[in-house]
Curated annotation (Swiss-Prot), chain B:
Quaternary structure (record): Component of a multi-subunit COQ enzyme complex, composed of at least COQ3, COQ4, COQ5, COQ6, COQ7 and COQ9.
UniProt subcellular location: Mitochondrion inner membrane
Pfam families reported in the protein's UniProt record: Coq4 (PF05019)
Keywords: Lyase, Membrane, Metal-binding, Mitochondrion, Mitochondrion inner membrane, Ubiquinone biosynthesis, Zinc
Summary of the function given for this chain in its UniProt record: Lyase that catalyzes the C1-decarboxylation of 4-hydroxy-3-methoxy-5-(all-trans-polyprenyl)benzoic acid into 2-methoxy-6-(all-trans-polyprenyl)phenol during ubiquinone biosynthesis.
CC terms in the record's Gene Ontology section: extrinsic component of mitochondrial inner membrane
Pathway: Cofactor biosynthesis; ubiquinone biosynthesis
Enzyme Commission number, as recorded: 4.1.1.130
Record protein name field: Ubiquinone biosynthesis protein COQ4, mitochondrial
């Protein structure tokens, strides 16, 4: 009955202070941080998410799935510190996270390697674990506070427009409601409708590479401390990142043809291919790729032959320079996603802010994408706190601009650096290979500079 | 005043600079450095005692395959200098050619050859099985019964005509990587087959022409050096013949024919040699022995 | 010749130290070994570099006291206290150097000038800079003493053969144990100085990173040189 009356009445617009579009890690972190901060917790916040998230995330924490999911990210100590400061880190399923102290990157052509060692240099966490922990903390905060954050799941945004009188962003949702807000935050991914609404250009290019992900278990041949491995092949880096209990998450950024080939292999062939990718020379690998593309029946035999030859030549002391071989794959964990670089011209407009992938996307080679988004959230929350405590209108550019000016240059530099690293390593032209190997060897022996790099990447540098 | 006069004038700067410079070499400093690094008087665990990690400063690295003689880079350089001069002055001594071949077989050259082999199914088979050619493995006794004009028969006839045997090939000693050493060994062993398929004899002129052919096809530096410098000390009539007939043939055929390193000779012994030639893309050059005989008889006539 | 007599002196001191406070029956049958050449070389190095180091610390505090005492009289007690402890350290090592006839560092005049200059310069830069300088120097010295302590603990065993049974039980001689205690105590005092400096706004110095890293680098270079020259 209530609904019948509503249908015939003009739709009453709901008004909120902040509407966050997107229930991914960025959106949930923003909501949790705003609710956690004593300055902003009184704001009326709505979080709109197009998919169903509440039930799956709650069940993730109650009955964790038996296998590790294939979307895993590497969190820096700075991100974990922030998540801890908003009270969310303790809600994560800690047993499914793996912190590691060592990152080894080695050149696919020359073998020049760089070793980064620092206690807890990064931690691997499944994306769902992050979302579930945040949601759990959000529910806890909601139960403690009067003004609750409203999560509207399974609700798509059908249109966004500026209200004719107030110029505030007004959203029409798929359940018929309409929502007006003082500040609209887009945490809605690369193809952000919020960004389009605000008329913000995003510039960049596609890397013409796909990231192939899968979850494996290492062969149980010897004990190793959890280490992050990355081999820079000319087609793109192959990374093996540690998960608990001897599992590992692989991200292999490679050309579209090779990505298609990798997904078409059966499981044993795929395992051998990954082992080959971490060890064999580029000439042997191109022979293997050709055999795989032409669907040769003796592909497995040939890969095994080259791997055995390699193992025969390897001295025992050098064995620890390569990751262990992978022996099992988690079925169904194979997937791929396209890689592109993009950076929005600005992160803030009148009554609009962009956070996370809506603002920038990058190559996964340094695992910085999500961490940049978390730093964005931290900065935006800081700007909103300052604005609220001074009584400003939080949707005003004056309130939002400090977030843009703090984050945009830093993100731009990081995006640029990762782009250059990708470009330097995308070639096997001998003089360039020699130059970059020499550079890596020199850098590897300069401890203080490496410590500085690690500090910058993990956000721990002394200010 | 008196005290000042008693003060001796001594040079201070130069001797102290010298002593501080030389002191680095002093035994005390080296010993104290070793103590700091924990190399002396450090109680070793049982495991460490079982490891024999102490090595004298100059020790040859371990051999990677039976017959391997690891050389330092300066030794390889000396070998190159000696063998290049020796091969130029006395090409009939096989040792010089062998050493020149191994000292100029840089890893990137052999790597390129190995990549060629890896990209070809028959080449891959050769790399996997690593066949070695001996008179037993080639079944020389049976070869004489093979059909005429087959590869096996032609090989047998060529061996008889030239009076050589496949067992006289020197094994590779100085190349570091075992697989690359095999590739070079394979090249050496197939050399007789290249003679057979081109019909060139083992006289000096024939070897030079074949060297250029091999260089255009395989890219091994020794063959290139041979083709460049070996024609210098030979007779001018031979050189004229080489440059006008055989060098153009070698350049053309070496470039357009298929990479010969991939051919699995042992398995195609029964194949007709002309069919093989057309498959590989090789034309037979004019018979060198005939040309030489004609030239000699012409000279006799004139004289 | 000189080496021989030096070894004799060392042997006597070893033997003397070993029999200190031990029961006669136990020591009569023990034959004590000499410290090896390497161990002697390392002891010489320790005394040389520590003497130079404490001289440097002495002069640094001297310089800082000079520079800061006029502008910041409130800092005089704390600087004086730290300086006096360094004077005590310096004197200890001076005595050890004479006792064991170790060649002191040839570049001692350079260390004097450099340390005084560093003390005065950082003092003139202000309280925070002076404290940051202290922090940097004490950090390096803390690590340096730790390294020495490590070697002194692990690698200074001498053969002690029981003449009756012929069994060899390598032991650290008493005087080395005293040396360990000395180094350990001095290290604790230096780290106390570090904590004091941090308490007194060392992190407030501008430019912090540049100042501390430059001073640490210089200290490490000076230590390396004093060990050898």
């Amino acid at each position: 009955m209530f609904q019948v009356i509503r249908r015939f009445a003009t739709s009453v617009s709901n008004v909120a202070d902040i509407v966050i579009i997107g229930g991914g890690p960025a959106g949930l972190t923003l909501g949790t941080a705003l609710k956690n901060s004593p300055v902003t917790k009184h704001l009326k916040i709505h979080l709109v998410e197009g998919g169903k998230i509440i039930e799956p995330l709650n069940s993730f924490l109650e009955t964790p799935p038996p296998n590790y999911l294939n979307r895993v990210v590497s969190l820096t100590p700075s991100t974990i510190g922030f998540l801890d400061s908003i009270g969310a880190w303790s809600h994560f399923n800690q047993e499914r996270t793996q912190s590691y102290d060592d990152i080894v990157t080695y050149d696919g052509v020359s073998g020049a390697r760089m070793n980064f060692e620092h206690p807890d240099i990064a931690t691997m966490v499944e994306t769902t674990n992050i979302q579930a922990g945040l949601l759990s903390r959000l529910n806890e905060l909601n139960s403690q506070q009067e003004v609750k954050l409203v999560i509207q799941e399974d609700t798509k945004v059908t249109s966004i427009a500026k209200d004719s009188i107030t110029q505030w962003p007004t959203l029409k949702l798929s359940n018929g409601d309409s929502l007006t807000c003082r500040l609209l935050v887009g945490c809605d991914g690369y193809n952000s409708p919020v960004r389009h609404f605000a008329g913000i250009e995003s510039r960049g290019w596609s890397y013409n590479r796909w990231g192939v992900v899968a979850t494996f278990k290492f062969a149980d041949t010897e004990f190793r401390f959890p280490t992050g491995w990355q081999r820079f092949l000319p087609t793109g880096p192959l990374a093996l990142l540690p998960l608990p209990n001897g599992y590992t998450s692989m991200v292999w950024s490679t050309t579209p043809e090779l990505a298609e080939m990798l997904l078409s292999l059966d499981e044993t062939e795929f395992l051998s291919m990954v082992n080959a990718g971490t060890r064999l020379s580029t000439e042997e690998l191109s022979m293997i790729y050709d055999l795989a593309k032409s669907k040769s029946p003796d592909l497995l035999e040939q890969i095994q032959w080259r791997l055995n030859l390699f193992a025969g030549k390897l001295k025992p002391a050098d064995e620890e320079n390569f990751p262990l071989q992978v022996s099992e794959i988690v079925t169904g964990s194979r997937a791929r996603f396209p890689l592109k670089l993009s950076h929005a011209d600005t992160y803030v407009e009148d009554r609009v802010a962009l956070v996370g992938d809506a603002a920038h996307t990058t190559h996964p080679l340094a695992g910085q994408g999500l961490n940049m988004g978390q730093e964005d959230v931290k900065s935006l929350v800081g700007a909103l706190e300052r604005a609220t405590s001074r009584g400003l209108d939080i949707g005003n550019s004056l309130a939002l601009e400090p977030y843009f000016s703090e984050r945009w240059p830093q993100n731009h530099v990081l995006l640029g650096v990762m782009d250059k690293i990708h470009k330097i390593y995308s070639t096997d032209f001998a003089p360039l290979v020699a130059a970059r190997s020499f550079g890596v060897d020199v850098l590897n022996s300069l401890g203080p500079i490496k410590d500085f790099m690690v500090g910058r990447i993990s956000g721990n540098s002394k200010r | 005043m008196l005290i000042v006069q008693q003060f001796q004038k001594r040079s201070f700067i130069i001797p102290s600079l010298i002593s501080s410079g030389l002191s680095y070499l002093s035994k005390d400093i080296r010993l104290a450095d070793k103590m700091e690094d924990g190399e002396l008087h450090f109680p070793k665990t049982e495991f460490e005692k079982s490891q024999n990690t102490s090595r004298p400063l100059f020790q040859r690295p371990e051999p990677n395959y039976p017959g391997h003689v690891p050389l330092y880079n300066f030794e390889k350089l000396l070998m190159f200098l000696g063998s290049s001069i020796g091969a130029f002055v006395n090409p009939t001594n096989n040792n010089f050619i062998v050493s020149l071949g191994e000292s100029t077989a840089f890893p990137w050259v052999l790597n390129r050859l190995r990549t060629q082999m890896l990209n070809d199914p028959s080449g891959r088979q050769i790399l996997k099985e690593r066949p070695h050619m001996t008179s037993k493995s080639l079944n020389l006794d049976e070869l004489k019964n093979y059909p005429d004009n087959s590869l096996g028969k032609s090989y047998f006839l060529w061996l008889e005509r030239e009076g050589v045997s496949p067992d006289t090939r020197v094994p590779v000693k100085y190349i570091t990587d075992p697989e690359l050493a095999f590739v070079f060994q394979r090249y050496r062993e197939c050399h007789d087959f290249y003679h057979t398929i081109t019909g060139l004899p083992i006289v000096r002129e024939g070897e030079i022409a074949l060297k250029l052919f091999e260089f255009m096809n395989l890219g091994i530096p020794m063959t290139g050096l041979g083709a460049l410098f070996a024609p210098i000390p030979i007779k001018s009539s031979q050189r004229r013949r080489l440059l006008s007939v055989y060098y153009p043939w070698a350049v053309k055929n070496g470039t357009i024919c298929k990479p010969l390193i991939n051919v699995y000779w042992e398995k195609i012994m029964k194949k007709d040699i002309d069919v093989l030639r057309s498959e590989l893309g090789i034309e037979k050059p004019p018979d060198m022995r005939e040309l030489r005989k004609k030239a000699r008889s012409k000279k006799k006539q004139v004289a | 010749m000189i080496r021989h007599s030096r070894n004799l002196i060392k042997l006597q001191s070893v033997r003397y130290a070993s029999t200190k406070g031990k029961e006669n029956s136990a020591t009569e049958n023990l034959r004590l070994g000499y410290l090896s050449d390497a161990q002697n070389a390392y002891m010489d190095r320790v005394i040389r570099v520590d003497q130079a180091g404490e001289l440097g610390a002495n002069f640094i505090y001297n310089g800082q006291y000079l520079a800061l005492s006029h502008k910041r009289p409130d800092l005089k007690p704390i600087l004086k206290h730290m300086w006096e402890q360094e004077i005590h350290h310096h004197n200890t090592f001076n005595n050890l150097q004479v006792e064991r006839r170790v060649r002191p560092s040839l570049l001692t005049p350079l260390w004097k000038v450099g340390a005084m200059g560093l003390g005065i310069a950082t003092g003139l830069m202000g309280k925070e800079a002076a404290m940051a300088c202290t922090e940097a120097v004490e950090t390096v010295i803390g690590g340096h003493y730790n390294q020495q302590l490590r070697v002194l603990t692990n690698q200074f065993h001498v053969d002690v053969v029981n003449e009756e049974t012929g069994v060899n039980t390598p032991t650290v001689p008493e005087e080395i144990k005293d040396m360990q205690k000395l180094v350990s105590q001095f290290r604790d005092e230096e780290l106390e100085h570090l904590d004091t400096a941090v308490e007194h706004d060392a992190h407030g110095a501008r430019p912090y990173w540049l100042l501390t890293e430059a001073i640490k680098l210089t200290c490490r270079g000076a230590i390396w040189t004093a060990e050898r020259v």
